[in-house]
Every structure is written in C-alpha cells, then in structure tokens.
Amino acid sequence: MARVLVLLSVVVASLLFSQGATFESQRLFNNAVIRVQHLHQLAAKMMDDFEEALLPEERKQLSKIFPLSFCNSDSIEAPAGKDEAQKSSVLKLLHTSYRLIESWEFPSRNLGNPNHISEKLADLKMGIGVLIEGCVDGQTGLDENDSLAPPFEDFYQTLSEGNLRKSFRLLSCFKKDMHKVETYLSVAKCRRSLDSNCTL
C-alpha cells in the first residue's frame, strides 16, 4: 500500500510540474506577442508620420517603389501568409521570428529612438530564444551558425530626410517584418495554448 501511495504522489507531483511548465510557457508566449504587437504598432505609427510629412507628389512617387523593393529579410526562408504559418511547426515559427528580429539588430539603430526600438528588439529576441529552448525536445536547436549575418544594403545605412526613398524602404520593411513576426508568434502561441478554442 505504501508503494501505491508513493507512486501516486510521484504521478501527482509530475502532473503539477508539467501544468506549471505549461502555464509558464503560455506566459512567455503572451509576453512575446504583446512585445511584437507593440513594435508593429510603433512601425505603423512611424510609417504614418513619415508619409504625412511628405508632399503629395513625393507620396505618389514612393508608393510605386515599395512593391518592387527588396527587404534585407527577404533572404530569410519564412512562411508566406497566415495559412502557410498555420502549417508550420511551432519551432519553425520561433526560429523564423528569431531570425527576422535578429536581422533588424543593426538597421534598427537608423530608425531614430522612438521608445528605444533596438532595446525592444533585443528583449524580444531574448524572449524568443527562451521559447525556442523550451520547445526543443530532441529536436535541432538554434545553433550559433544558424544565426543570421545580415547582408546590409545601402538603404539600411541612413534614415534621413535627404533620402526619402531609403527612409521609406527602411520603414516599410520594418513594418512588414514586424507584421510577419506578430503573425508567426500568434500562431505559435495559439498552438501551444491550453484553450482548445484558440483562434487568430
């Protein structure tokens, strides 16, 4: 009888530990999603402010440029849209988000200092790294050689009124990438959610 009680207490303790780890994981996912939503909103606000400062003719000219523009992050293999993201594994979504955030470490310094974007990106990257570590169970982790050495282009070097095209590209790419990361983290969070009715 004593063995049964010991075994039962081990099983109960194991379940409680597992449930606690799940809640901690959910808390970390919530924090990551909130942080990237804030960055996406900041990017949208910066873009709106930039466009409002343009003359109508400049605005018209720049709107033709971006669809043809190349973003630094376009070289990162990533799901195209929400449908493809929903078919990807949580670990792949986290890896992709990590690499997208990492690709902005240097360029974010050129975005000015609205609420310290570089610091917010570093915090988010660290949080995603913790989530990756928590998801890795016998799977390949994020190795040092898996980190991105960004191929910076000239348009990532300057954000100034003197070069509207470069500034517009930088802000557009930042906004686009924060939207991607927000989508990927939201899908991953939903997949790991205890709520079976989690929808995006």
From Swiss-Prot:
Its main location: secreted. One of its GO terms (biological process) is response to peptide hormone. Residues 1-22 form the signal peptide. Growth hormone plays an important role in growth control and is involved in the regulation of several anabolic processes. Implicated as an osmoregulatory substance important for seawater adaptation. It comes from Ictalurus punctatus (Channel catfish). Zn(2+) binds at residues 38, 182. It is found in: Secreted. GO terms for molecular function: growth hormone activity; growth hormone receptor binding; metal ion binding. It comes from the Eukaryota. It holds the Pfam family Hormone_1. SUPFAM superfamilies: 4-helical cytokines. CDD domains: somatotropin_like. Belongs to the somatotropin/prolactin family. Keywords: Disulfide bond, Hormone, Metal-binding, Secreted, Signal, Zinc. Disulfide bonds join 71-173, 190-198. One of its GO terms (cellular component) is extracellular space. This is Somatotropin.
